[in-house]
Each structure stands twice: as structure tokens, then as C-alpha cells.
Amino acid sequence: LSSQVTQELTALMDETMKELKAYKSELEEQLSPVAEETRARLSKELQAAQARLGADMEDVRSRLAQYRSEVQAMLGQSTDELRARLASHLRKLRKRLLRDVDDLQKR
């Protein structure tokens, strides 16, 4: 009886393993196209994201160049205005100094 049970158990295990291998093969066949489709879709999405990122980075680069130009122009104007005011003050100081020197010489 024990030998018969062992044989039946072995046969059942072998049959179950064969069914499991067949199911595995069937599942792999079914999933292979799905996996390939998923890989292709992900690849497309990554390429699109990379293109968008590249475009966004180029936009940022362009905007930064524009802002830099604007800041340089503003700084240039500020520098020119400061230079003009300083020149005006220096002229006034020179006139005052010359007047004071003239007054001192007259004394």
C-alpha cells in the first residue's frame, strides 16, 4: 500500500509539474508581446519626455540670456546716470573750490 501511495504521489507530482511548466510556457508566450509593447511604449514616453526637457532647457537658456541682457542694460543706464551725477557734483565742487581759492587769494 505504501509503495502504491508513493507511486501515485510521484505521478501526481510529475503531472502537476508538467501542467505547471505548460502554464508557465503559455504565460510567457502571452506576456512576451505585452512586455514588448510596454517596453516600446515606455521608450517612446521617455524619448518624448527627453525632447520636452530639452525644449524646456533651451527656453530657460534663452530667457536667461534675455534677462542677462536686460540687467546689463539696466546696469549700464545706472552707471551712466551715476557717472553723469558724479560729474555734475565734481563740477560744482570745482567751482566752489576755485571761488574759495580766489577769496583766499584776495585776502
UniProtKB/Swiss-Prot annotation:
Residues 11-107 are annotated as: 5 X 22 AA approximate tandem repeats. One of its GO terms (biological process) is negative regulation of amyloid fibril formation. Residues 89-99 are annotated as: LDL and other lipoprotein receptors binding. It comes from the Eukaryota. Keywords: Chylomicron, Endosome, Extracellular matrix, HDL, Heparin-binding, Lipid transport, Lipid-binding, Oxidation, Phosphoprotein, Repeat, Secreted, Transport, VLDL. Sequence repeats lie at residues 11-32, 33-54, 55-76, 77-98, 99-107. GO terms for molecular function: cholesterol transfer activity; heparan sulfate proteoglycan binding; heparin binding; identical protein binding; low-density lipoprotein particle receptor binding; phosphatidylcholine-sterol O-acyltransferase activator activity; phospholipid binding. Heparin binds at residues 93-96. The modification Phosphoserine is found at residue 78. GO terms for cellular component: chylomicron; extracellular exosome; extracellular matrix; extracellular space; high-density lipoprotein particle; intermediate-density lipoprotein particle; low-density lipoprotein particle; multivesicular body, internal vesicle. It is found in: Secreted; Secreted, Extracellular space; Secreted, Extracellular space, Extracellular matrix; Extracellular vesicle. InterPro entries: ApoA_E, Apolipoprotein_A1/A4/E. APOE exists as multiple glycosylated and sialylated glycoforms within cells and in plasma. The extent of glycosylation and sialylation are tissue and context specific. Glycated in plasma VLDL. Pfam families: Apolipoprotein (PF01442). APOE is an apolipoprotein, a protein associating with lipid particles, that mainly functions in lipoprotein-mediated lipid transport between organs via the plasma and interstitial fluids. APOE is a core component of plasma lipoproteins and is involved in their production, conversion and clearance. Apolipoproteins are amphipathic molecules that interact both with lipids of the lipoprotein particle core and the aqueous environment of the plasma. Homotetramer. May interact with ABCA1; functionally associated with ABCA1 in the biogenesis of HDLs. May interact with APP/A4 amyloid-beta peptide; the interaction is extremely stable in vitro but its physiological significance is unclear. May interact with MAPT. May interact with MAP2. In the cerebrospinal fluid, interacts with secreted SORL1. Interacts with PMEL; this allows the loading of PMEL luminal fragment on ILVs to induce fibril nucleation. This is Apolipoprotein E. It comes from Saimiri sciureus (Common squirrel monkey).
